[in-house]
Amino acid sequence: MPKKILGLPNRWRVRIATFLTLTLLSPAGVLTSTSAWAANPLAPPSLKTVAIPEPPDLANFVRDKTVAIQLGKALFWDMQLGGDGVQACASCHFHAGADSRKRNQMGPGLLAGDTTFDKGGPNYTLKAQDFPFHQRQAPVDRQSSPVVANTNDIVSSQGVRLTQFTGVNSGSRIDEGTLLQDPVFQVSGTTIRRVEPRNTPTAINAVFFLHNFWDGRANRIFNGQNPFGPVDNQARIFVNNNGLLQQVPLRLDFSSLASQAVGPPLSNFEMSFQGRTWPEVGRKMLSLRPLGRQMVHPEDTVLGPLTLRTQALGSRVSGLPGLNATYAQLIQQAFQPQYWNSSQGITLGALQTLGPTSNNPRSFAQHLGPAWASDPKKGPLGAGQYTQMEANFSFFFGLAVQLYEATLVADDSRFDRFQEGRIELTAQEKRGLDIFLVQGRCIQCHGGPVLSNATVNLLLVEGIVERMAMIVGEAFYDVGFYNVADTLTSDDIGRGGNTPFGEPKIPLSYSKLGLDKRDGTLPAYLIPYVPDLPCAAPCTLRRLDIDGAFKTPGLRNVELTGPYFHNGGMATLMQVVEFYVRGGNFPQANVDNLNPFIAEIGFLQGNLSGKQDLVAFLLTLTDERVKQEMAPFDHPQLFVPNGQDAGQPGMPDQMLEIPAVGAGGRPAAGLPPLQTFLGLDPFQP
């Protein structure tokens, strides 16, 4: 345990007191259940007790939520969205909401400024022996054991090849562009698919987070255009006000999933040729049949009513690909008419490229400044003009995808049922739960029913910035974002990074924004969105604990979402447990920003059965519907790149088919359940 307790947030002091009391009163410091069917009163309740966050003024924008969800699911899974006609949102979120591919999934430490691979190289095929990335001599669960290997390489998801965007052609799924020489992601001079600089988190249960992405840059407030919420005070959507087309700022709260959704489709790492903007994405998608190259299962819980005469026989779906409605029709049915019904052409402002920044190698393009609307009587669109529906496509896309992802709630695991008093856990699983709550200290960061402190239901009660006792001294930090020393702070500063807006660049962290607010240097337009620091005047504390901090992920379905951490550097749950038991990888190097609960766990050192108990508990967090892709986790057919064929000219993609499944999931299709990353045993060190 850390030496300092008196300056910790109240909720942590209460948890420490509970830990001490129960350790003293329980035999050997292990909790015991008093009833075979009793829920554990110290554990979080079932996730079914948590309301799904939603914008309070949603009805002002959406007139048919059911159709909006259909639109969102179609867009999320549609491969035509990518600049290459291949990359869908789902391309990186098809396996329990995450990514299980193993070839061309590695990148160098780009966020540390490193462009050199330590392991494998581009198009490498991952193997079990590559993990963990940070290795110690035995015993690996002790901080004193020497380091024998370490790399700042990452495992993430392959995206697009580096390509300069030049235009879209109506009816074509592939954008026009010029393939560029990629200095990093190339094999013998051939540009291959780039790999994202951070591991892919799961989209399942993401609706419960106040902010999304590992660094939280997907703002809780959706501005209709990009991930950065009110930080971009120039972002606008177009509203038809009684025949007058106006640019209006959008500030839609509890919408970090919408903010997140509009980022990747313009990212020159993930889905886009660089220089593409949202109106051009809109023009392209509105000219295409939704899911036009993918089969949709007739029993799909959301899209089934829109399928084109399809039939399912086992894992095969026959008939015609796509849907029987257009994207324009779905938008018109889903959204209030003032956001799409103008006949005026829109001339947008100057094109601006944002990024890369010192902490983010990605870039994206958007139009800046005021736009001009043409006289509707002048007929067809002029050169360079867009329709209102095209110009607002980012708004439709973000909100529709958010509403679809809000249906991806995994709240029926064995742990949920146990906490509801409906089933029993095994003795081993209950011992693991006790370790999770007490000796392991896991609950300190993985709190609440989502098993993360970064969620809406916790942060709205406890506050988004707290004052915390560090190993030495005190600091302000963003609740739910922690430096746990899995990588060096200098390898990726995470929450300590900046947005691409402002000079100097506006920070991501509420702690830093709060300090700027106190100092009087915060831009005036951001003041309403930044809470005061929790420090009564006169307050001289200026220290921030934000560098190297990342959003605490939820743990549900963690069996299926490896590799783990923001760098993807651990392949099994046992490797994760051993990391925490030894007190992290770099506790001394990261001491200035280290979460004070990251310390050696003596109870588990050399205690294999205790570690196995903890892993066994983590496996109770799997929702069987996720594992079997049963409703609401069913989906259309998808083809994902799984590396490039080095034996062919130009190194074409090797494609992996993800078959369409309906409400009955994989069992109804005769498919096996989803597997762990690389098929590894979760108990394997």
Predicted regions span which residues?
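Generic hydrophobic, helix-prone segments enriched in Leu/Val/Ile
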Residues: 29, 281-295, 493, 515, ...
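Active-site rim elements
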Residues: 190, 244, 388, 541-542, ...
